[in-house]
Amino acid sequence: MAKYEDGVMYYFIINPASQSGRGYKIWKKIEQRLVRDGVEYQAYLTEYAGQATEYARKLTSHCKEARVIVVVGGDGTMNEVVDGIVSCDMVTLGYIPVGTGSDLARGLRLSRRPMRGLRRIFKARRIRQIDYGVIAYGDDVLRHRRFIVSAGIGLDAEVCQHMQRSAIKNICNRIHLRRLSYRILGFIQYLKAKPIRGYILLDGTRRVEFNYIYFISAQIQPCE
């Protein structure tokens, strides 16, 4: 295995439920390798939605030394971690994709093989800077949230929300037909959807109005 950097503590944030529970099995294999090679690490396994954000906030608040945080999970887990990071120039993110879609991994051309991803993190000689987006929402109280892949409202968000709790997703994943699950749920939600009127503001000045809006989506990565 590639030599890791001596004296560096690696903080792993893991979603064990990612990819229909495969995330936990992959993490145990990674952990065995870490123990075998004497890597200093701390592991934080999520148990509910939003906990990855809490872990990231806890790890990056008031940090005075370099922090290497490695995310083991899907796009949703990575989004939560990015949203939770407190402004700190000392934080470096690593990513081992274990998601159903892994759009971020495809966009960044990262390997889907966990051990290869671990080696890439340990032998990295340079740090890549990537963009993230920020959405503002709320009526009485304005809230902000970061995202690293995409953010949407309307039909696409409805499909994603139903996908999280749909039995169709798990069934299709087991038989390697992930795209089919999106098509089925997408078609169902399309039949239920009702377009609305609205507008977008470009660069804070130019207002563009639309009469039939099914969804609005902002993309950071080329894959979704």
Task: For the regions a language model picked out, list residue spans one by one.
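Active-site-adjacent beta-strand anchor residues
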Residues: 42-45, 71, 94, 149
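Glycine-rich beta-strand-to-loop/alpha-helix junction loops that act as flexible
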Residues: 16, 72-74, 98
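Phosphate-binding core of ATP-grasp and ATP-grasp-like enzymes
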Residues: 217-224
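Catalytic core of DAGKc-family lipid kinases
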Residues: 87-215
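ATP/NTP phosphate-donor binding region
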Residues: 1-69, 79, 115-118
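Short Gly/Thr/Asp-enriched flexible loops that form oxyanion-binding sites at enzyme active sites
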Residues: 77-89
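Short amphipathic alpha-helical segments
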Residues: 24-26, 82-85, 106-108
